[in-house]
Swiss-Prot record:
Keyword annotations of the record: Glycoprotein, Signal, Vacuole
Lineage: Eukaryota, Viridiplantae, Streptophyta, Embryophyta, Tracheophyta
TM annotation in the entry: none
Name of the encoding gene: SSL3
GO cellular component: endoplasmic reticulum; plant-type vacuole
UniProt protein name: Protein STRICTOSIDINE SYNTHASE-LIKE 3
UniProt keyword Glycoprotein, yes or no: yes
The species this protein was found in: Arabidopsis thaliana
Origin superkingdom: Eukaryota
Subcellular location: Vacuole
């Protein structure tokens, strides 16, 4: 009898989730939403290296509540900075005593772009205000290149101001979620477009869908052409050139791995997996020794692993009447935390730094090494963390 009652309750619950009569689910406004399998490697194959000392808890928190969502951090060719893009669409410059407005990407800025109390409040107007993500300086002329999530690849001169468009489409397909970039010695720009369907404001839907419309692209300043180098990717994110310029490393965010794309030599035009990651990667930056710092947004967990391999179960779960915030907390294992990993060119783990409980540093988006310090930005936090390397 008890089993019969439980079966009926489950049936009613399943029907409720299937039709979502009160539009309580996180995908209720997207009737055509689809989920796909993510070929995430087994947990047993992941790197075993961990930072049991939680060394990132020794970081210094700077500029608390002075910068909202500083995704990327850059220093100009003279070593000045940092520069960072924030949630209201501006690129800010630290002049040594205070933050000043350096540049912006949108020419449609209005009062909608004024500072807001919460980072989430900016999402609905990001397409109007712009949302700068990856930042890179051209070391030859001091131009700053910007990966704006909505406007594509932008460029602004050393004096700052309104950035101009470099490219916003490839192969007739608009850039929908421009994410990170790097520039070689000839001025070619390599960059990621995380999705051809979802814009940044719907990044959680992109993560949970597993769709594979992401691309890695190249802009040639001489021909003004943008070409696709790698396609059919699940949330490509960070990208950084190798020290000698013969390859770049990019990350596949949903799968959680690093791939090397060869630009020169007998392997030119091909790519290969060089590392499986502890979790879900964001930006990548190369240090002066040619090693790569990868910002890992969060560790993998059993929940994310199971959801990756069973898309129908994932979609059913998404139809539950629970908030996007709760969905996010499940993805990150219950609480935001911080992981930064240094890799060699061959994909060998050289160093792991963590704040596993998020006591000081959380949700790292980028790790920039400069003068013995790691500068860490976060698209979800309102500070920059600085860690002194031993």
């Amino acid at each position: 009898m008890a089993m019969s009652i439980l079966a009926k309750i489950f049936l009613v619950f399943a029907i409720y989730c299937a039709i979502d009569p009160f539009s309580h689910s996180s995908i209720s406004k997207f009737p055509d939403f689809k989920t796909y399998k993510i070929d995430m490697p087994p947990l047993s194959s992941l790197p075993k290296e961990r930072d049991r000392q939680n060394l990132l808890q020794n970081s210094e928190i700077r500029f608390l509540n002075e910068v909202q969502g500083p995704e990327s951090i850059a220093f100009d060719p003279q070593g000045r900075g940092p520069y960072t893009g924030v949630a209201d669409g501006r690129i800010l410059f630290w002049n040594g005593t205070r933050w000043t407005d350096f540049a912006y990407t949108s020419n449609n800025r209005s009062e909608l772009c004024d500072p807001k109390p919460s980072l989430l409040d900016y999402l609905k107007d990001e397409d109007i205000c712009g949302r700068p993500l990856g930042l890179r300086f051209d070391k030859k002329n001091g131009d700053l290149y910007i990966a704006d999530a909505y406007l594509g690849i932008m460029k602004v001169g050393p004096e700052g101001g309104l950035a101009t468009s470099v490219t916003n489409e490839a192969d007739g397909v608009p850039l929908r979620f421009t994410n990170d970039l790097d520039i070689d010695d000839e001025g070619n720009v390599y960059f990621t477009d995380s999705s051809s369907f979802f814009q940044r404001r719907k990044f959680m839907l992109l993560i949970v869908s597993g769709e594979d419309s992401g691309r890695v692209l190249k802009y040639n300043p001489k021909t003004k052409e943008t070409t696709t180098l790698v396609r059919n990717l699940q949330f490509p994110n960070g990208l950084s050139l190798g020290k000698d310029g013969s390859f770049f490393i990019f990350c596949e965010g949903s799968i959680g791995r690093l791939r090397k794309y060869w630009l020169k030599g007998e392997k030119a035009g091909t790519s290969e997996v060089v590392a499986l990651l502890h979790g879900f990667p964001d930006n990548i930056r190369t240090n002066k020794d040619g090693d790569f710092w990868v910002a890992v947004h969060c560790h993998r967990n059993i929940f994310t692993h199971l959801m990756a391999h069973y898309p129908r179960v994932r979609k059913f779960f998404l139809k539950l009447p629970i908030s996007v915030k709760f969905q996010y907390l499940l993805q990150v294992g219950g609480w935001p935390h911080a992981v930064a990993v240094k890799y060699s060119e061959e994909g060998k783990v050289l160093k792991v730094l963590e704040d596993s409980k998020g006591k000081v540093v959380k949700a790292v988006s980028e790790v920039e090494e400069k003068d013995g310090k790691l500068w860490m930005g976060s698209v979800l936090m309102s500070f920059i963390a600085v860690y002194d390397l031993p």
